[in-house]
Design a protein with these regions (language model features):
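Short, glycine/serine-rich, charged loops/turns that create anion-binding
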Residues: 13, 49, 156
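ATP-binding/phosphotransfer module of carbohydrate and carboxylate kinases, centering on a glycine-rich
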Residues: 1-3, 18-29, 68-203
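Glycine-rich phosphate-binding loop of actin/hexokinase-like ATP-binding domains
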Residues: 26-88
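N-terminal glycine/serine-rich phosphate-binding loop of ATP-dependent small-molecule kinases
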Residues: 1-14
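Active-site glycine-centered loops adjacent to acidic/histidine catalytic or metal-binding residues
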Residues: 11, 37, 197
């Protein structure tokens, strides 16, 4: 299609633009998005624009090293590094934590059901995921003075079990003036990425 203009971007950046123009980000200025699914992705609106950085690799939040500080086995990420956020806070990471705590094989959907039923290993797996998210968010705040965070994707539906440790850990690792940070969980917003892809032409 030599006569047609097109744009190409990753799903996390598209979801971030979807939130900026059509979702929770409409009411915010500068904010970060964590996409929580099979992996962990992210995007950042700063100065009113989606930031891309050198080579388009700005805000690869899924690969912030947080796992080496946790009281459980360090895991190798698909990127090749150890202890990435993705190894703890993605559906894959939560499943690995559950197996480590319980010794049982379960799917991510089954673990969510176990958490709803009060299963201790499932609740702990989500708590660890929330703790890791809190560490990552605190790092971003201390580096960039950003305090508005949107969490989207399938894992974000587990807000009930993620939020307590996320907030506790965030406050433990940030200055008091940042303790009014917003943590917004969007659920069922499956069109954010599609709408954001369309919004690439608005940037």
């Amino acid at each position: 299609f030599p006569s047609k203009a097109f744009s190409l971007d990753n799903d996390a950046n598209a979801a971030t633009l979807g939130e900026k123009y059509f979702g929770a980000g409409k009411a915010l200025g500068n904010f970060c998005v964590f996409t929580l699914g099979t992996g962990v992705g992210g995007g950042c609106i700063f100065g009113g624009r989606l930031q891309r950085g050198r080579n388009g690799n700005f805000f690869e939040v899924g690969h912030v090293p947080v796992g080496l500080t946790m009281d459980l086995s360090a895991r190798r990420c698909g990127c090749g590094n150890m202890g990435c956020l993705e190894t703890l806070s993605s559906a894959t990471g939560i499943t690995a934590s559950y197996i480590e705590f319980s010794g049982k094989q379960r799917t991510a959907a089954e673990i969510a059901g176990e958490a709803r039923a009060g299963d201790a290993a499932a609740v702990k797996a989500y708590a660890i995921a929330g703790q890791a998210l809190g560490l990552a968010a605190a790092t971003i705040t201390q580096l960039m003075n950003l305090t508005d965070f949107i969490f989207t994707g399938g894992v974000a539906a587990a807000e009930t079990w993620l939020r307590p440790e996320l907030e506790r850990t965030y406050r433990a690792h940030t200055f008091a003036l940042f303790h009014n940070a917003q943590f917004i969980f969007t659920q069922g917003d499956e069109d954010a990425g599609i709408l954001g892809a369309a919004a690439l032409f608005l940037e």
